[in-house]
Curated annotation (Swiss-Prot):
It is a peripheral membrane protein. GO terms for molecular function: carbohydrate binding. Residues 282-310 are annotated as: Disordered. This is Protein OS-9 homolog. A mannooligosaccharide derivative binds at residues 139, 151, 209, 215, 237, 243. The gene is yos9.
């Protein structure tokens, strides 16, 4: 089945109107109306800002079951296809080959990395007076720029308004990045689908009972949302007493290299109704024309179709 974390919003036909139109609905609502195709696993969708982005379309063009093999043979290598079922109905869906798209994307644009490092850390310095705190169930995490990252459990004290942090662990302390040499040594620049992020490591945390080594946390600073407020967007213990944390820095969004690429056009997922034989009750074009149209790189335009009001 689809996962709400994989498809937070899909563009789908509206229901209960005289015409089919496209609209954006929360997945929790549209999930009742979508057949169980496992496109989430096929497309490896992670979040709303993942690349490539997708839009979903129902086509009013029906295809003959006997034409499917021919369509598959003619489909561009940048596209994949699958058959799916919803009750008694069969659908043929054409969707992008996400692996090829990512392989062909520019993951490391040409930038002056040292200049990018300087510009980026200047924006991160704006967190100097910011205290970030994130509660994740039993544990709470906080980040203080230039100082540390901590993990602790907040325990209310009986008969008092005070809350005790017990236990508390320092996951890592900030390195010295004041000199140019330290700046280069302690700040790494990475790219994910052409978007830059800065990364550093806070070391010398509380000693770990399991590894017998000090805890450490890898911090990634990026423009990860459209929010004007800095926030901890991701946290994970990747191995015993080794952690990763991602922090959204609004200032980085003003730098082109770090900015979310919202203007990237979405890749289409188009599904067609499959029929056993030609019928006057459906909109079915000349068989060979349909084969060529469905197999082409750009799926056919979805038209407005008159429907009965429910």
């Amino acid at each position: 089945m689809f996962s709400s974390s994989m498809f937070p919003h899909l563009i789908l036909p509206a229901i209960g109107s005289s015409k089919v139109r496209t609209m954006v609905l929360p997945f929790a609502f549209v999930g009742f109306f979508i057949f169980p195709i496992c496109l989430a696993s096929l497309l490896d969708w992670n979040d709303a800002y993942e690349y490539p982005k997708y839009s979903f379309e129902w086509s009013n063009v029906s295809i003959l079951e006997g034409d499917i093999d021919s369509i598959k043979e003619k489909t561009e290598k940048t596209k994949l296809s699958s058959l799916f079922y919803a009750g008694k109905h069969e659908y043929f869906c054409v969707y992008p080959n996400a692996s090829l798209i990512k392989q062909n994307s520019t993951t490391e644009p040409s930038y002056d990395l040292q200049e990018l490092r300087i510009q980026g850390t200047e924006k991160i310095n704006e967190l100097a007076n910011v205290f970030l705190i994130e509660n994740r169930g039993y544990w709470t995490y906080d980040y203080v720029y230039g100082q540390h990252v901590r993990q602790y459990h907040l325990e209310p004290q009986q008969g008092s308004d005070k809350v005790l942090a017990n236990p508390m662990y320092i996951l890592g302390t900030a390195p010295n990045t004041q000199t140019k040499k330290n700046l280069e040594e302690n700040w790494a620049i990475g790219f994910v689908e052409g978007k830059a992020y800065l990364q550093t490591t806070f070391r010398n945390g509380t000693m770990c009972d399991i590894t017998k080594r000090p805890r450490h946390v890898i911090l990634s600073y990026e423009c990860s949302t459209n929010s004007d407020t800095p926030e901890i967007t991701q946290y994970q213990e990747v191995s015993s007493c080794a952690y990763s944390m991602t922090i959204h820095v609004p200032g980085l969004c003003s730098l082109p290299a770090f900015k979310i690429q919202e203007d990237i056009p979405s890749e289409k997922i188009v599904c067609y109704n499959v029929i056993k034989e030609k019928s006057n009750e459906v909109d079915h074009k000349d068989s060979q024309h349909v084969v060529d149209e469905v197999a082409q790189t750009s799926p056919p335009e979805v038209k407005e179709v008159e429907t009965q009001s429910s």
